[in-house]
């Protein structure tokens, strides 16, 4: 009996250590250690490898979007247009309300905070290899294509196209399982090695540590609001969804991209017993591109901090209201790109808030410090919204589609 218990424990430990979350955590630790101790000559080798892996993952992202959203729309049949509209409404509502919550916290907390001047970062070695693998189309083009081709196939009852999309989904699944998942831990390790090397972790983080902690707490508060709301609306246990999202959360911390984390998020959502398979395949890829509550919440709080630090005052309430409402729309142009929310909304930051070059540079720097946690909030929040979709489908007697995908 004792031998059996020992063997059983060994199997459990082996399973845990070989799991994706364990590999990702190991990658983070190894990456930080490497970044702190290796010389520039080693980083000259690591930077190109990181960029190549990033190119590979980025190339697959539009394929994942097309491979899941388009077939899911065809499987929803006549209910596709309705479910798409509902998904858009709840995603934008979540992002904008998260921004409003962050704005309120900013007016209450920021006047009592004091920040020093930022420290310059160590420059990374140039990518001497410079390999570029352009995506077959931008992520937003893939999203638009998926929605249009899926709806058109439903409206015209195009059986050949529907079958073709299903075959394409199977192909994409193999790409994810055979290529993306295996290289993720390596990519995450290299990402954190570059962050540690340039000093983002050791120099910039202490300066804005209080602000970052406040924002992360805000993420958890908003996730609690989303999941409790989803549980009450659907009448199902939200913990049955949330408990499976650990790997997706960790992956998002490493990739800093909702779209790049999509494959892992799908695996997590598929494990939940309360989420409908058709809603998972439709909602999770869609929300990865349009639901950026964590990033929006973060950016709202940080623009207020930067305004206070550099310009001596907070933006007016009216200005911030306009900024929050528009930010939820502009952020949709940023999926799949680390730090993309800020990049996509630079026009708002400059045009509405009046930031100059120093303001935008500082904004980009401090946003990058917590970019991974904002992305993790985005991805985890998608599970709550998918639970809402499941609840809506069941309350309105939308027939469950037969979808069988091995994730």
Language model segments and positions:
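Signature of multi-pass transmembrane helix bundles
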Residues: 14-39, 51-60, 82-240, 399-407
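Juxtamembrane helix-boundary/capping and inter-helix hinge elements in multi-pass membrane proteins
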Residues: 39, 74-82, 154-159, 167, ...
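Transmembrane alpha-helix interface/packing and boundary motifs in multi-pass membrane proteins
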Residues: 247-256, 287-293, 325-338, 371
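Transmembrane helix boundary and interhelical junction motifs in multipass membrane proteins
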Residues: 64, 183, 257-265, 296-301, ...
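Short amphipathic alpha-helical coupling elements at transmembrane boundaries
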Residues: 47-58, 163-178, 243-251, 267, ...
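Membrane-interface alpha-helices at helix entry/exit sites of multi-pass transporters
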Residues: 81-87, 174-181, 274-288, 314-318, ...
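Membrane-embedded helical hairpins/re-entrant loop segments and their flanking transmembrane helices
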Residues: 228-287, 309-315
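Transmembrane alpha-helical segments and their short flanking loops
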Residues: 114, 301-407
């Amino acid at each position: 009996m004792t031998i059996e218990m020992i063997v059983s424990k060994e199997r459990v430990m082996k399973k845990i250590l070989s799991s994706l979350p364990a590999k990702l955590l190991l990658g983070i630790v190894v990456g930080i250690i490497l970044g702190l101790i290796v010389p520039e000559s080693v980083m000259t080798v690591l930077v190109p490898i990181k960029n190549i892996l990033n190119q590979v993952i980025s190339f697959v992202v539009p394929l994942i979007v097309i491979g899941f959203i388009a077939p899911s729309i065809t499987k929803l049949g006549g209910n596709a247009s309705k479910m798409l509209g509902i998904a858009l409404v709840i995603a934008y509502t979540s992002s904008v309300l998260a921004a409003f919550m962050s704005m309120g916290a900013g007016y209450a907390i920021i006047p009592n905070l004091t920040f020093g001047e930022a420290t310059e970062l160590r420059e990374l070695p140039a990518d001497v290899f410079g390999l570029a693998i352009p995506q077959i189309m931008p992520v937003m083009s893939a999203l638009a294509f998926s929605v249009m081709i899926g709806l058109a196939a439903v409206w015209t009852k195009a059986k050949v196209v529907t079958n073709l999309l299903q075959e394409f989904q199977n192909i994409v699944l193999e790409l994810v399982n055979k290529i993306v998942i295996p290289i993720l831990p390596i990519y995450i390790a290299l990402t954190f090695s570059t962050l540690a090397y340039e000093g983002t972790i050791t120099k910039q983080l202490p300066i804005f540590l209080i602000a970052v902690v406040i924002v992360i707490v805000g993420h958890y508060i908003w996730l609690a609001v989303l999941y409790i709301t989803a549980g009450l609306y659907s009448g199902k246990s939200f913990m049955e969804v949330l408990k499976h999202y650990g790997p997706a959360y960790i992956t998002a911390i490493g990739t800093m991209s909702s779209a790049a984390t999509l494959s892992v998020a799908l695996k997590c959502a598929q494990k939940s017993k309360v989420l409908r398979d058709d809603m998972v395949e439709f909602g999770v890829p869609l929300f990865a591109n349009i639901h950026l509550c964590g990033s929006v919440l973060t950016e709202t709080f940080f623009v207020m901090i930067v305004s206070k630090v550099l310009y001596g005052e907070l933006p007016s309430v009216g200005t911030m209201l306009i900024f929050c409402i528009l930010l939820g729309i502009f952020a949709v142009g940023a999926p799949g790109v680390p730090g993309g929310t800020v990049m996509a909304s630079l026009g708002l930051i400059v045009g509405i808030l009046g930031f100059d070059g120093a303001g935008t540079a500082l904004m980009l720097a401090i946003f990058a410090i917590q970019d991974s946690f904002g992305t993790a909030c985005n991805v985890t929040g998608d599970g709550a919204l998918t639970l809402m979709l499941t609840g809506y489908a069941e309350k309105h007697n939308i027939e469950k589609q037969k979808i069988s995908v091995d994730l």
